[in-house]
Amino acid sequence: MKRLLYLLAILLAPIHVSAQMLFSENMTMSIDSTKTLQGTISPSLNFQTEKENVFTFRNSANINLLIKRSRVINLINKFEFSTYGKKVTLSGGYIHAEFRYLLDHAFEVYPFAESQWAASRGMAFKFSTGLQSRYRLVNSSTTLMFATLGLFYEYEEWERPMPAPNGPKYAYSHRIKSHLSLSMRNKIGEHWELTTTAIHQATPDTYLKKARFGGAVDLKYNITPSIGIRGAYRLIYDTDPIVDIRKDYNVVDAGLDISF
C-alpha cells in the first residue's frame, strides 16, 4: 500500500517537458504478464553554485497496470523543481496516458491522451488525443520490434520569439495528424539494452511537405535486474514550425532507472 501511494504521488506531481514528442514508444516496449503493477522511476539531482545555491531535482515515471492479462493502463510523466536559495520553482511538464487492448498475441490498439506545458523552445501548452494500433513484427529472445500507426488531434500554443509591437504574443495550431513509427529493442549480452524509435507525423494533406520527424535512442546498462543506468538521445525535426524557431531540436540525457 505504501508503494502504491508513493507511485501515485509521483504521477500527480507537476511535470517537466523537453520537446513536442514524448517518444512513449521507447518506454512501452514490453509488459511482464506476471506482475499486475510494474514500471520504472528515474530520479536525478543537480547542484550549482551561482549567486545562490541551486538544487534541481528531476524524476520521470513509467507505470503499467495490467488488467486480466489483455488490458494495460499505461501512465508516463516527468516533473522537475528547483530551489534558488530559499525560493522553490516548479517547471513545466507532461503526462501521457493510454489504455492498451491486446486483440491478438501480436496486435493491439489503444486510445491515448497527453498534455504538455511550459516546454522549452517557447511551447506554452500542448494537448493531443487519438487512437493508435501497434503490431509486433519481431519477438525473439534478443530482439523486439513494433510498427505503430495512428490518427490523433493536436492543439499547440506557442510563444512568438519576437512578436510585433501590437501583434499577438502567441501562435495557435489545431490539427488532425497521422502517426507512423517503428521501434526496436535489442538485448546486447547480459547487461546492455539498446532501444531505438523512428517517428513520422503529418497532416493528411501535407504528408511530406510539412512533416515532423523524430528519432530516439536509449542505451541502458543493467547493474541489477532492478537498477540500471540509461543514456538517451532525442531528435525532433519539424519541417514547418508555427513560430520562427530552429527546425531541429536535440536532447542528450543520462540518469538512473529503478524498476519494480
Functional labels for PLM-detected ranges:
Residues 45-47, 65, 101, 135-137, ...:
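Residue-level signature of outer-membrane beta-barrel architecture
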Residues 1-35:
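Cleavable N-terminal export/targeting peptides
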Residues 41-47, 75-81, 111-115, 131, ...:
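Transmembrane beta-barrel strands of outer-membrane/channel proteins
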Residues 35-37, 53-57, 89-93, 123-129, ...:
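Residues that define the transmembrane beta-barrel architecture of outer-membrane proteins
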Residues 144-226:
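Outer-membrane beta-barrel transmembrane domain signature
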Residues 222, 248-260:
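Outer-membrane beta-barrel "beta-signal"
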Residues 37, 68-75, 106-109, 141-145, ...:
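Repeated loop/turn-to-beta-strand initiation elements of outer-membrane beta-barrel proteins
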